[in-house]
């Protein structure tokens, strides 16, 4: 009996520790921060998986053609070689790299470069676009699903699908499996990205906390895109193809387990929390003119980045005889102005929240000017400055308009955010689905200069459209159905809705300050007539 006493004490101590940790995890403020960490890790993983294949797939597909597996190592033989990738950008690898790379070799073991053929370039472009294409197709379904199921279960589903996709990448031996894994990642992203951003908007309902939290999420997205290519390239060369994907799979699994511990999505309390009001249907949100303006801005501002990534390397080689390291480094400095743009917009939004539309319009103008300047650059340094301006403008637009979407849902619809952020994800996916496939054809038929000028002009022309959002900050926040049901007797809800509608029709006071798209029937929650 004596040995059981220490065992019992250990169990009691473990139980107390578990209860203490559980209580700490359930403390509202701490739980909100943990949820932000979980979502940021999920977004980081998604973007790392999106970009980690940049240095791996072209060489791997070329090795499939050659009949060998993994990177070819050459010992004690000097050969011109591509340096390890150092940036979050697919251009240096997606473009046709048939010209000889600049030699900076050594006599040590190095990764022998294998350049994709023209048909393999098409395969690589389709592979990169497949993720965004499937994401584009699934988002109209994932948004309403998130509205109905709350945010934690779809986020868990997304992390699980991303885990499966990453494992498939690790063990893929042919192009079909790579394509299936890439497409599966798009399915996971449609759930994880949308539910994650929606969860942040739900957990941080007030400004400036909401803008700050969404800004942190955007910084993690940018960092994931930056760190993934060198992470993948170094591990691929020294540890093999499977290792970078298995590391990402392990982090994805850990994030899912942390979500289970913090949110407890299958508990009775979680099911009670999931009893949300019925969200506005996604097709009705798409018809909301304010939301349509924001979605158009998100698509327009991301088109230059999505179209320049797969084309700028070839243009640099032909225009300025750029070396491989220059093509690899050209996007790296842009991370700093992107984070600076996020920080600046968050600080400005905290002091002047009614000017979010202006920050977005300035961002579009900066993107437009930067895109138009790119073809005029004839050396490396001016090109870096132009691309830094491009990413700075994208940060302004994203950081200003993502919180605006949540605010529009709060004041014009029901405060359920799955569908509206599915629309935002659709906006991004349109650009990144077209970029890897269409950009090269436009360059071949019209030229790189015309492509850049066209994208810049589109952003400059769209900037004044955001003037239509200038009165959004003056709208009165509506009370959600959940709040009404808590504060009002059930029999009075219908009467309150009818009274408000009658006042509007009889020429009573308007529901909110007038705007170009305003009507009283739109300023009250759509659920009253669903």
Curated annotation (Swiss-Prot):
Electrogenic antiporter that exchanges one cholinergic neurotransmitter, acetylcholine or choline, with two intravesicular protons across the membrane of synaptic vesicles. Uses the electrochemical proton gradient established by the V-type proton-pump ATPase to store neurotransmitters inside the vesicles prior to their release via exocytosis. Determines cholinergic vesicular quantal size at presynaptic nerve terminals in developing neuro-muscular junctions with an impact on motor neuron differentiation and innervation pattern. Residues 471-530 are annotated as: Mediates interaction with SEC14L1. Residues 504-530 are annotated as: Disordered. Belongs to the major facilitator superfamily. Vesicular transporter family. Glycans are attached at residues 89, 96. It is a multi-pass membrane protein. It holds the Pfam family MFS_1. It comes from the Eukaryota. This is Vesicular acetylcholine transporter. It is found in: Cytoplasmic vesicle, Secretory vesicle, Synaptic vesicle membrane. One of its GO terms (molecular function) is acetylcholine:proton antiporter activity. Potently inhibited by L-vesamicol. Keywords: Cytoplasmic vesicle, Glycoprotein, Membrane, Neurotransmitter transport, Synapse, Transmembrane, Transmembrane helix, Transport.
């Amino acid at each position: 009996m004596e040995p059981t006493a220490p065992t019992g004490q250990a169990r009691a101590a473990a139980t107390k520790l578990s209860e203490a940790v559980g209580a700490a995890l359930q403390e509202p403020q701490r739980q909100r921060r943990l949820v932000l960490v979980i979502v940021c890790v999920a977004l980081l993983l998604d973007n790392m998986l999106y970009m980690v294949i940049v240095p791996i797939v072209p060489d791997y597909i070329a090795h499939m053609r050659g009949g060998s597996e993994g990177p070819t190592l050459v010992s004690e033989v000097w050969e011109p070689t591509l340096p390890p990738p150092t940036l979050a950008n697919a251009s240096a690898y997606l473009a046709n790299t048939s010209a000889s790379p600049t030699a900076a070799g050594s006599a040590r073991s190095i990764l022998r470069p294998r350049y994709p053929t023209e048909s393999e370039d098409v395969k690589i472009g389709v592979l990169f676009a497949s993720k965004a294409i499937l994401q584009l197709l699934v988002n109209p379904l994932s948004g309403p699903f998130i509205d109905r199921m709350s945010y934690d279960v779809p986020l868990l589903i997304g992390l699980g699908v991303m885990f499966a996709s990453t494992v498939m990448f690790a063990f893929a031996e042919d192009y079909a499996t790579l394509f299936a894994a890439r497409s599966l990642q798009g399915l996971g992203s449609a759930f994880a990205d949308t539910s994650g951003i929606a969860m942040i908007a739900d957990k941080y309902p007030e400004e400036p906390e909401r803008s700050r939290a969404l800004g942190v999420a955007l910084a993690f997205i940018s960092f994931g895109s930056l760190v993934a290519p060198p992470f993948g390239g170094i591990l691929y060369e020294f540890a093999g193809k499977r290792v970078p994907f298995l590391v990402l799979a392990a982090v994805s699994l850990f994030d899912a387990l942390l979500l289970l511990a913090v949110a407890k999505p299958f508990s009775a309390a979680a099911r009670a929390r999931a009893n949300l009001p019925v969200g506005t249907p996604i097709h009705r949100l798409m018809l909301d003119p304010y939301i349509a303006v924001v979605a158009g801005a998100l698509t327009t501002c991301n088109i230059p980045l999505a179209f320049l990534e797969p084309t700028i390397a070839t243009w640099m080689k032909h225009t300025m005889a750029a070396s491989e390291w220059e093509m690899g480094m050209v996007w790296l400095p842009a991370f700093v102005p992107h984070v600076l743009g996020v920080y600046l917009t968050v600080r400005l939004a905290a002091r002047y929240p009614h000017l979010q539309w202006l920050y977005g319009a300035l961002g579009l103008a900066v993107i437009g000017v930067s895109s138009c300047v790119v073809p005029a650059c004839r050396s490396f340094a001016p090109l870096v400055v132009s691309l830094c301006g491009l990413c700075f403008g994208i940060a302004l637009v994203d950081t200003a308009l993502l919180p605006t979407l949540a605010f529009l849902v709060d004041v014009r619809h029901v405060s359920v955010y799955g569908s509206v952020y599915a629309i935002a994800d659709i906006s991004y996916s349109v650009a990144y689905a077209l970029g890897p496939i269409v950009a090269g054809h436009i360059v071949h038929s019209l030229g790189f200069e015309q492509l850049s000028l066209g994208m810049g002009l589109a952003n400059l022309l769209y900037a004044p459209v955001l003037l239509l959002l200038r009165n959004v900050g003056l709208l009165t926040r509506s009370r959600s159905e959940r709040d009404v049901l808590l504060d009002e007797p059930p029999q009075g809800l219908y009467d309150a809705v009818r009274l408000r509608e009658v006042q509007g029709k009889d020429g009573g006071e308007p529901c909110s300050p007038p705007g170009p798209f305003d009507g009283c029937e739109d300023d009250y929650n759509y659920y009253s007539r669903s």
